[in-house]
Amino acid sequence: MLSESSCIPGFETMITVRPGSHVHRLITVLGLAGEYPVRSLGVLGNERTLRALVSKLSTTQELRNPDTDERMRVKLLQMTGIGNAKAIRFCKGALPILEWIHPDAYGYYMAAFYNHRFPGGMAHRDRNLRVAETIGMHLTAGIETRAYLLPALQNRAILRITPDAPAFYLARDFKKITPAEQNKTMFTRIVGAIFYPGGCYAVYNTRNAAMKWNGMGEFKALHSLTELARMNAGVQSIDSAILLGESYDTALTTLLESDKIRRLELRFDGIYRHIYFVPMNAGGIRQFRLLTVPDWKEKLLELLFDPDVRSYNRGFMEYDASIGGTCVFSHLDGDIARLIRFREAMQTGAGSFEVLCFDDQAPFLREYLGPYITLKTIDAATVEAELGL
């Protein structure tokens, strides 16, 4: 909804900035990201509704704070850039509205974005938009990403700092801990990290292009993140990353490009044992929620297979169960690093193979694995219901 206020045809509608509404989410994201790409509005909710809302907020409107009944008549948004780089920003005169979101939101914005200035060239801008999309995905999935609500990470002692619930920390906030972090993350593609009970994921966003990895830079970033996880979350090692992309076409392109790289240390599966590809759509939002359930891997395998057929990581290849002589592999988690190992074993070994997947993963898997593999689709809603998502 554009507003929680009553709407009478022919009359101007006042927009109420109510928690949970599209306008509240949009203001929250801009307060964290500075700008947001128009092409990715669908990540934040109904794309058609949000486009109409952005158009409306790009003209002078009256907005209302439901908690205090304070009113503000202002042009909230402006557009910048063209094509894929077209983005939404606040108008400077509207910045006080951040106080409606949280008392610390305005101060965070002004410190993070140089008092509402956006220096830098196209590469800097592209990184900003990657970060913005990533924030939008986490916020929509219910993963806390509001930096002003998260306890600050530190490197002085081994403490339990991170929240019990899943939380996303931006890479730019890693750099505030010590100046040395600046050099470790400056030239890598990492945009942040999710801390959840029992683990941590490095998070990347490749948007609509094949992921290109800075091999040694990513190793250094991983080492730095592992130290932060050890000092703040009780996590001793990190072997997993989440890779966001526009669609499964992006995942396929990334895998095919990776096949051309012969030096393992420059391939993403040489850096992280597990890479979970998450498309930036409603299916990806569901996948985010799955990946942050405590002990989700075991719960998922228990749901899919009886104990007597499971592999329990035994055997000559990556598979999850053996049923009637067929090796069954689950790709419900979107782990493309594990998928590479499965395909390599499948191509060099004889036997019957079956892959479990969600409906939206099937075309990508058919293209990557070839026509002779059996694909069995699983209803996403059923999995969510069984896991309590």
How would you name each of these model-derived features?
Residues 1-128, 151:
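Nuclease-adjacent, charged terminal/linker segments that flank catalytic cores
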Residues 87-110, 122-140, 191-193, 327-331, ...:
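General detector of folded, globular domains
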Residues 123-255:
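Mid-protein regulatory/catalytic core that forms ligand/cofactor-binding pockets
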Residues 27, 51-54, 135, 253, ...:
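Generic detector of well-ordered alpha-helical segments enriched in charged/polar residues
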Residues 60-65, 144-148, 299-309:
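Short secondary-structure junctions
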Residues 45, 53-61, 134-145, 224-233, ...:
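Hydrophobic, Leu/Ile/Phe/Ala-enriched alpha-helical segments that form helix-helix packing faces
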Residues 203-210, 231-234, 238-389:
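Long, compositionally biased intrinsically disordered regions
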